[in-house]
């Protein structure tokens, strides 16, 4: 029987500080729990939403129960006995970091057990010899930034100077990343991409996981805004991914929606679809669920939870986006085929109530739905790789090097 897998990854949707959170300075972080608490206490009310966090479809798949198992606390406003239709687990990250690439790679069978390179200095973050080499190879006359920053704030602070000089803005964060900001029209999108490609080649030996192009538009700080033409340049995964096994062993289709292809350096991806907003990501995902052939894996990263609300520490915005996603999840469930396996998960936390603006080291929810899957708690996963191993089992692929299968279908012992 031909099968399909649909993975919906809510970027940054952690469910509580993991057992090693202290090592990352993240004790007390709980993305879901703290959003739910704020909503329950009417501290996340806005023109768009109010009251307790309402996620009935995620709850039916086991979200609240997964959080309860992870933290011993049910998120405020959630049901202790929901109408459960899914099987659920929670997962601890094995990888040595709390970034997007580490989380995504691990769940597809390539945990990051080495240390990425980082730029730890808050100011003058990048080594002079690196900056000099970038200038020499790209012929840019100068640069701005060279610091740790919030991506939206640095555009406000330096965007006008960038328009005067056309010097690109360089910045980083606690992640293994080198980000380049430039005006999409005045500097040029192709010029920005070319600059990022050169920078990536220079930085790859330092094990910098990603160089990210961050284009923006607008005439002054009041109307500057990022565009949908972000592009990530990532190091290639160091181990064979589930995607590659699926293509080699079953001639499967691997469909990337959003930034998935960039995260995996386009390894094992057969089709790519971009989308600019949360609504567009939902629309494209539903279109593929309706139209993709059997023997396909559809994988969407819903980046806006992280980029628009987690990093910006916007509790109300995060809650509103979750409620919008939950309403669209109803459509997903209605359009699944007879033998589709649906998985909802995350890659790390980014608690909008927590100090700073960085990711948070948290457990992630792992929620499964299939018509023949018994609703039940599947336990704690010691690695996100259990997700990939479970998919390999479902699709009849050879096992991955990491992870264990979590799935037990009706009729199986």
UniProtKB/Swiss-Prot annotation:
Keywords assigned by UniProt, alphabetized: Cytoplasm, Isomerase, Manganese, Metal-binding
CDD domains per UniProt: PPM
Binding residues for Mn(2+) 2: 306, 311, 359
Residues that hold Mn(2+) 1 according to the record: 11, 347-348
Gene Ontology molecular-function annotations: magnesium ion binding; manganese ion binding; phosphopentomutase activity
Pfam families linked to this entry: Metalloenzyme
Catalytic activity: 2-deoxy-alpha-D-ribose 1-phosphate = 2-deoxy-D-ribose 5-phosphate; alpha-D-ribose 1-phosphate = D-ribose 5-phosphate
Gene3D superfamilies: Alkaline Phosphatase, subunit A (3.40.720.10), Phosphopentomutase (3.30.70.1250)
Names of required cofactors: Mn(2+)
EC id: 5.4.2.7
GO BP, sorted A to Z: 2-deoxyribose 1-phosphate catabolic process; 5-phosphoribose 1-diphosphate biosynthetic process; metabolic compound salvage; nucleotide metabolic process
Cofactor notes: Binds 2 manganese ions.
Protein localization: Cytoplasm
Record carries keyword Cytoplasm: yes
InterPro entries: Alkaline_phosphatase_core_sf, DeoB, Metalloenzyme, Phosphopentomutase_DeoB_cap_sf
Pathway where this protein functions: Carbohydrate degradation; 2-deoxy-D-ribose 1-phosphate degradation; D-glyceraldehyde 3-phosphate and acetaldehyde from 2-deoxy-alpha-D-ribose 1-phosphate: step 1/2
Gene Ontology terms: cellular component: cytosol
NCBIfam families (alphabetical): deoB (TIGR01696), PRK05362.1 (NF003766)
HAMAP family named in the record: Phosphopentomut (MF_00740)
Role: Isomerase that catalyzes the conversion of deoxy-ribose 1-phosphate (dRib-1-P) and ribose 1-phosphate (Rib-1-P) to deoxy-ribose 5-phosphate (dRib-5-P) and ribose 5-phosphate (Rib-5-P), respectively.
UniProt record similarity statement: Belongs to the phosphopentomutase family.
Record's protein name: Phosphopentomutase
Species per Swiss-Prot/TrEMBL record: Helicobacter pylori (strain Shi470)
